[in-house]
């Protein structure tokens, strides 16, 4: 589905059920919504969402329901899908009678069971190993990514399933080693480059989703804050638990609210803020903190830079009765100034009426628009998405 959309400009279907709640399932679900598809449900047999909470939250706030501890019982159709039935499973992954749910869909997307693409290396005679931590059969490599066959290097999904950032750094290490082997750089230059890359790779492999934490249910962040169980099971933070995270602030004037609640390797918000208002610190997995000594100027760079769409600009005192919420907008067509609609909460349910005050674009925003909506003041900490009077995601 991702290839069809991104490379060929083809919509995979009209109404889709996504199986798998890892980062691939979450990100592709959002891309399907951007493509104009309707995502009927996001389903996973696991009891908890497997991907980053911020990616789940940006899907949930559009109204897509999550069904954890559920999987597919039956797909319907002859030459194409016409429907699907799912059911809840117990701790042994057996179907629980009476929990069946039916959806009329024309497409089922599978985002489960990822395994390393290592077949070519096996055919080339590289020594292989079965490594569950890396997702299955992978080549045995040294610290530079070189396999048992001299001159053949492996990185990314060939050597193990990880995030894209880790794959790119592994590729840089392997590329530097290959350049050294061919005489383009010295061993000293290789060591200098690979040392810096390994330091970055080590940081990316820390936090809640570190390899040693796979399969574990963590209850606290590194800062000692309770991890939201509702986020893990339903895809969104509860209104009453949001303010316990250090990026969520209440103050006069425009200010950022950062609903990042998990220790993940991410810090573009810190880099984007020229005023030093947002701090992550030296450890890339730390929760972002809003520094009150550096006032926000409302530029919106942090909102546009967050790939998890977890940052909002609030003005809780826009006027006597209203507040404004500025949120990232990546759907077409974008609402026009003055458009009336409904503000949705974190769970995708309507919370109040809303009016678009501004839709801002800039080259620095990298094609992300900033939509500012006016809402009743009492909903400032609840309204997180805009749906125009017409039906559809943001339409």
PLM segments and residue spans:
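Residues forming the flavin
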Residues: 2-232
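Ferredoxin-like iron-sulfur electron-transfer modules
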Residues: 97, 158-159, 243-265, 279-298, ...
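Short, surface-exposed secondary-structure boundary micro-motifs
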Residues: 179, 346-348
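Iron-sulfur cluster-binding cysteine motifs and their immediate structural context
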Residues: 267-285, 301-317, 346
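Short, well-ordered loop/turn sites that connect or cap secondary structure elements
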Residues: 334-336
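Short beta-strand-centered aromatic/proline hotspots
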Residues: 349-363
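Short, solvent-exposed secondary-structure boundary/capping segments
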Residues: 361-375
């Amino acid at each position: 589905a991702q290839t069809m959309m991104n490379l060929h400009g083809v919509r995979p279907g009209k109404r889709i059920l996504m199986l798998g709640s890892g980062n691939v399932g979450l990100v592709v679900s959002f891309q399907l919504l951007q493509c104009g598809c309707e995502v009927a449900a996001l389903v996973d047999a696991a009891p908890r969402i497997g991907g980053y909470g911020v990616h789940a939250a940006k899907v949930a706030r559009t109204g897509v329901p999550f069904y954890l501890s559920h999987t597919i019982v039956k797909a319907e159709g002859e030459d194409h899908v016409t429907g699907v039935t799912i059911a809840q499973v117990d701790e042994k992954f057996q179907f629980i009678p009476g929990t069946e749910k039916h959806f009329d869909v024309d497409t089922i997307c599978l985002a489960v069971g990822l395994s390393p693409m290592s077949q070519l290396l096996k055919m080339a005679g590289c020594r292989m190993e079965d490594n569950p931590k890396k997702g299955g059969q992978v080549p045995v490599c040294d610290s530079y990514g070189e396999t048992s066959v001299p001159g053949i290097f492996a990185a990314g999904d060939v050597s193990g399933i990880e995030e894209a950032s880790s794959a790119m750094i592994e590729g840089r290490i392997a590329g530097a080693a290959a350049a050294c082997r061919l005489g383009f750089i010295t061993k000293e230059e290789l060591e200098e480059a690979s040392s810096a890359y390994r330091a970055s790779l080590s940081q990316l492999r820390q936090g809640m989703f570190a390899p040693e934490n796979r399969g574990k249910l963590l209850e606290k962040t590194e800062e000692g804050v309770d991890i939201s169980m509702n986020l893990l099971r339903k895809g969104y933070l509860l209104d009453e638990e949001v303010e316990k995270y250090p990026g969520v602030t209440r103050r006069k004037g425009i200010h950022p609210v950062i609903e990042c609640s998990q220790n993940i390797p991410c810090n573009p918000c810190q880099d984007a803020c020229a005023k030093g208002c947002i701090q992550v610190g030296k450890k890339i997995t730390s929760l972002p903190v809003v520094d009150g000594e550096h006032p926000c100027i409302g530029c919106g760079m942090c909102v546009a830079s967050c790939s998890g769409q977890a940052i909002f600009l609030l003005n809780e005192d826009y006027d006597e009765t209203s507040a404004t919420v500025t949120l990232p907008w990546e759907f077409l067509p974008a609402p026009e100034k003055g458009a009336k609609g409904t503000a949705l909460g974190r769970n995708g349910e309507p919370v109040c009426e809303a009016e678009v005050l501004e839709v801002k674009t800039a080259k620095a925003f990298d094609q992300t628009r900033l939509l500012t909506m006016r809402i009743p003041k009492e909903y400032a900490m609840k309204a997180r998405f805009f749906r125009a009077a017409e039906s559809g995601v943001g339409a």
